[in-house]
């Protein structure tokens, strides 16, 4: 009945593209573009329409359908699906382009490189070797029209219409009846009386010679043209002549031909072919071989075709990371290939892998990700950054390796615009406060200050008011000179985020104190910044109506537009200090010696001041730092590929243990100021200035003279005067926080950046401290005496044996 009849073409899971057909090999087939209905993936569809009176061609088409369906080889056109009806034949294969069309398109774009042609011919010869040596089949149709190219640039052998068995099963070679194909037949086939001895591969190797001639010289006009090699490379001419020789006996086996061309200096002996051969066998390679291969791959990617990198190298890189435990070595080639991808492809293929990499505990992989974040940050959306990446990145702030801490700080420049309110204004500020106050590496403290200045415009108004002034003020007390410069430039970079009252009462007093800094670079930047703030104050003083315009950004929401200004002010610090940090880390991971981190106050006139050791590494002005940026960047890039050679260890150490260790630092070294100066031991010195409890200890190292002389009797310290008049405390004393030590008030939260953490607390007299210390010593002495008395009166056996008799 009619309603049981169904159209098999309509139910076929593939459909033809409305675009006109691409043509195809001379013969019955017409090549169409197509797609799979379910997924939309691209395919190629070979269509043959059955016509009355063409039974011979129909049998040829059906034989080709059967051969292609049963033959599986990487260099033979891949069969996907097929449809056979009384009216038509459909063969669905991977998406391919005829070689002639491909070469013409590439010629318009500059032509194929010799290495691409060598690999393409290598694939065709390898397919012939498979057919002749493994399957005992004669292709009988090797020509330009029988070769196709997939999207990765891989050459595939098709055109199996006239294939027959080399053993004679099923009769001789089928008749072609197409003049365009018969011109590729070897001369011995044209002479029916010829009794020359030939091998089973002789005819196909002749046709291979014709293919080589056409690849380099264009369409073959006649067989006599084969005598002139034309544009065939010299390294291939000798082997080509063997293929088109009149004696079929001397034509080499396909395997032998490959071996000859792969010899040193041969046409198929190059880096591109070597890379492809390794990728084909990568699943059976040893881990050490894979590591070496991926390390060297990046150098070659620039010379490889873009389609090859996208469609062949990239899948292998993703597979190597997903299942092969390749580690950090895949990152550099992965991101290099990613540059050629469209945004949609990048999101689909690389971003899921990157997100997974951030959860790795491999230090080398983590630092590579941080170093190369600029290449993929634009493809990350905000939810992914806040929920899947930022929580893992913050572990780097607590890492024991200085290089990871530094790269984590730098990465915040890229992540900050995508962070939400909680992560940016709360979580990140906690880590920055801890690094700036406690980190034992001066360059890391410096870069923390620089980073804060660059991302200041992204902070909320309340966070800016609470954090920026206090953080930059603390940086100006750092014994590391570049940190003090960074603090000054931080004020300058964020000048539009402060009210006029803050400029006059909080910022200018701090900057004025730096005009007598021992380092000229600090003094120079301080004077420049002071003039900038004074000009603003003066303009508002002359015209008070400008106040609203000047302070428009103070209470505004985050304003990313000012980030560029911040970057230009402080762009020198990240690069310049990065190279210094790298040198320190490569030399030894221990902290910098105290005599280089704590500059001394200049000696009086008349005595030549010794040049500090750090002066060689610290430039005199910020302009010089900018000139060093290119050289430092080159040095960092030169050393970037050496991270795998170092023993990074694991990140499995709990963050709590690191925090506990840092809290222990703050409990050490509560000695006197004189002790800080007279003892050059670096560890004890660091414990003083890195403590959260000691507010002013960063500036004590260089504000004190090199030799401490007792003041005349009766002399009072400046901070002991009541500058405010009637008030007994130092509430009105703006200088008290610079010279006195905090009182024994409740300790502030070390993870907070509130005002109480940064402003000076009420001073405690030295007599009270001495009295407390004396009481503790007396109490300890009494405890020890009581224990000794108790031991003397104890009778009976002791813990480790019987009591000796008198």
From Swiss-Prot:
It is found in: Cytoplasm, Cytoskeleton, Microtubule organizing center, Centrosome; Cytoplasm; Endoplasmic reticulum-Golgi intermediate compartment; Golgi apparatus, cis-Golgi network. Residues 601-611 have a biased composition (Pro residues). GO terms for cellular component: centrosome; cis-Golgi network; COPI vesicle coat; cytoplasm; cytosol; endoplasmic reticulum-Golgi intermediate compartment; Golgi apparatus. Gene3D superfamilies: Leucine-rich Repeat Variant, Phosphorylase Kinase, domain 1, Transferase(Phosphotransferase) domain 1. One of its GO terms (biological process) is spinal cord motor neuron differentiation. Residues 763-773, 780-793 have a biased composition (Basic and acidic residues). Expressed in diaphragm, quadriceps, thymus, liver, lung, spleen, kidney, heart and brain. Prominently expressed in neurons, and enriched at central nervous system synapses and neuromuscular junctions. The keyword Coiled coil applies. Homooligomer. Interacts with GORAB. Interacts with COPA, COPB1 and COPB2. Interacts with AP2B1. This is N-terminal kinase-like protein. It comes from Mus musculus (Mouse). The lineage of its organism: Eukaryota, Metazoa, Chordata, Craniata, Vertebrata.
